[in-house]
UniProtKB/Swiss-Prot annotation:
Entry binding sites for FAD: 17-46, 285-295
Database matches in Gene3D superfamilies: 3.30.70.2450, FAD/NAD(P)-binding domain (3.50.50.60)
GO biological processes: 3-(3-hydroxy)phenylpropionate catabolic process; 3-phenylpropionate catabolic process
Pfam families named in the record: FAD_binding_3
SUPFAM superfamilies: FAD/NAD(P)-binding domain
Domain of life according to the entry: Bacteria
Protein name listed in UniProt: 3-(3-hydroxy-phenyl)propionate/3-hydroxycinnamic acid hydroxylase
Keywords: Aromatic hydrocarbons catabolism, FAD, Flavoprotein, NAD, Oxidoreductase
Gene Ontology molecular function: 3-(3-hydroxyphenyl)propionate hydroxylase activity; FAD binding
Cofactor: FAD
Species: Shigella sonnei (strain Ss046)
Length: 554
């Protein structure tokens, strides 16, 4: 499967607002988001095309919500398998941990299998929507330098020609071996696992059983995963003394596959590849005008499928902030909140992935025996079983500082958490997901109240200049009540009753939602104005031009 890049004219001595190093998933997502915000973007990739073999196989609800934010989710969904369960098995085949959450609080299934090259291709094609975005393949980044107001990149083409790019900002999405990170001497702290795994992808799935199974066999742990489009992935631990070359030999590959298939000779191999699992975290995510994202900032073992999804979180968190800074709507201090918000959660996902790997393949054999016995007992405790079944162990992103205003008891506050995405009913009767009604914008969402009531004219002017959507949520039966309509306010019905439950639970009637769908603040009408002033301050927002007149509607 070859994904050719479009015929693009070279950019020699060109100036752009953002240069992105790396056309992997994080770089492509950054380019799509910035593209829809009107930012001039240039993506440079040293390969001559997208990587066309399967890599990541798990995409979660947060990543799908990110795809939705750039208008690509409907193109991505055909390459996914929703509600993809993960089951840990003992050597005898007994399931001791079943992970299959059935919740969709963010609008999408929490666990999904997917084919990464096809989703990457969707994102690359998505760039064609934006005349302000270009992607240059076969460009190796040889050097770069930072000045006070720009970054200069020096590239070499496949033909040996030199090109120079000047950008206001550089986003490094160039992978775990990031040239940008190494050039800046940013420590990449962590460790490399002592064992390796060989990944075998097979077409025309010879098993065709659903879900993903992690067999905790002390002789040789392995993974069996059903993927979309009839692809089967097997992963086998490489045992001490074995090499990739040995395992690639037909007789040894046949021996491996005979562990999981009745006829190991009758398969269509897509590829075989040995991986080393790393757990590393960059010490800094921002170095002046350079920002690290995705694997350039953090890498983790695959066992919870969170490497790809963590990169999507980086892109969603960073892109809207970078757009505001470039548009002059916020000072560049806002970009410091990127590391402040993302680094701790990335570390939590690394720790979770390492723990899952130790469950699959404990360092000591006695630990596996203990695991099997304890898990058997815990399965008889319903709260513990639900804890795993509903994936409550997954650290949900929660920010305690950054671009937000937290007041009251931090432990139970929704501030710094992702807001829910239920279905809402529009005034024309259409039912849609909440984000579709908001777009790539801030939102001030009020339960039953006019969100403009507690705002001054100056505040309305400032937040409208950011593209903020003001939304009044009412019970669905009230959607056509004229007395509740206010100019400049979107009126939506609470189709599923989830928004009413959310506001009741959190003792607030107004929420300020950021473009990345995180709760920046909560309030009631009488405190909203003061809260927005605090939020504008912590986000270092600039004031709009004074000659822009805005009429407040009470």
């Amino acid at each position: 499967m070859a994904i050719q890049h479009p015929d693009i004219q070279p950019a020699v001595n060109h100036s752009v607002q953002v240069a992105i190093a790396g056309a992997g998933p994080v770089g492509l997502m950054m380019a799509n988001y910035l593209g829809q915000m009107g930012i001039d973007v240039l993506v440079v990739e040293k390969l001559d095309k997208l990587i066309d073999y399967p890599r990541a196989i798990g995409i979660d609800d947060e990543a799908l919500r990110t795809m939705q934010s750039v208008g690509l989710v409907e193109n991505v969904l055909p390459h996914t398998t929703p509600w993809h369960a993960m089951r840990f098995l003992t050597p005898k085949g007994r399931c001791f941990a079943d992970i299959q959450p059935m919740t969709d609080e963010f609008g999408w299934p929490r666990r999904n299998a997917f084919i990464q090259p096809q989703v990457d291709a969707v994102m690359l094609e998505g760039l064609s929507r934006f005349p302000n975005v270009r992607c240059l393949f076969s460009r190796e980044l040889e050097a770069f330098s930072q000045q006070d107001d720009e970054v200069t990149l020096h590239l070499k083409t496949a033909e040996g020609q030199r090109e120079t790019i000047k950008a206001q900002w550089l986003v490094a999405c160039d992978g775990g071996a990031s040239f940008v990170r190494r050039t800046l001497n940013v420590p990449f702290e962590g460790k490399t696992a002592p064992n390796q795994w060989i990944v075998v992808d097979i077409a025309n799935d010879p098993l065709s059983t659903p879900h993903i199974y992690l067999c905790c066999d002390p002789v040789r742990p392995y993974v069996s995963a059903a993927l979309p489009h009839a692809v089967r992935r097997f992963e086998f631990m490489v045992m001490p003394g074995e090499t990739e070359e040995q395992l690639r030999e037909p007789q040894n590959m046949r021996k491996l596959l005979s562990k999981v298939l009745p006829n190991p000779d009758n398969v269509e191999l897509i590829r075989q590849r040995v991986y080393t699992h790393n757990a590393r975290l960059a010490q800094r995510f921002r170095i002046d005008r350079v920002l690290l994202a995705g694997d350039a900032a953090h890498i983790m073992p695959v066992w919870q499928g969170q490497g790809y999804n963590s990169g999507m979180r980086d892109a969603f968190n960073l892109a809207w902030k970078l757009a505001l800074v470039i548009q002059g709507k916020a000072r560049d201090a806002l970009l410091d909140t990127y590391q402040q918000e993302r680094r701790d959660h990335a570390k939590a996902m690394i720790d979770l992935s390492v723990t899952a790997g130790n469950v699959l393949a404990p360092p000591k054999r006695w630990q596996g025996t203990l695991r099997d016995g304890v898990s058997w007992l815990l399965n008889y405790l319903p709260p513990v079983k639900r804890y795993f079944l509903e994936m409550r162990f997954k650290p949900m992103p929660q920010y305690y500082g950054g671009a937000l205003v937290r007041e009251g008891e931090a432990k139970h506050s929704p501030v710094g958490k992702m807001f829910i995405q239920p279905k809402v009913t529009l005034e024309n009767g259409d039912v849609t997901l909440l984000d579709n009604a908001i777009g790539a914008n801030f939102a001030v969402i009020g339960w039953g109240c006019n969100p403009l009531w507690g705002m001054s004219d100056e505040q309305i002017q400032q937040w409208r200049a950011l593209g903020t959507r003001f939304i009044q949520v009412v019970p669905e039966v009230q959607i056509h009540t004229a007395q509740d309509n206010h100019d400049g306010v979107l009126h939506v019905g609470d189709t599923q009753g989830r928004l009413r439950s959310w506001f009741a639970q959190h003792n607030a009637s107004l929420v300020v939602m950021r473009p990345d769908r995180f709760v920046a603040a909560t309030a009631i009408p009488q405190t909203l104005g003061n809260t927005l002033n605090k939020l504008a301050s912590v986000m270092t927002l600039t004031r709009p031009d004074a000659d822009v007149s805005v009429e407040k509607v009470a």
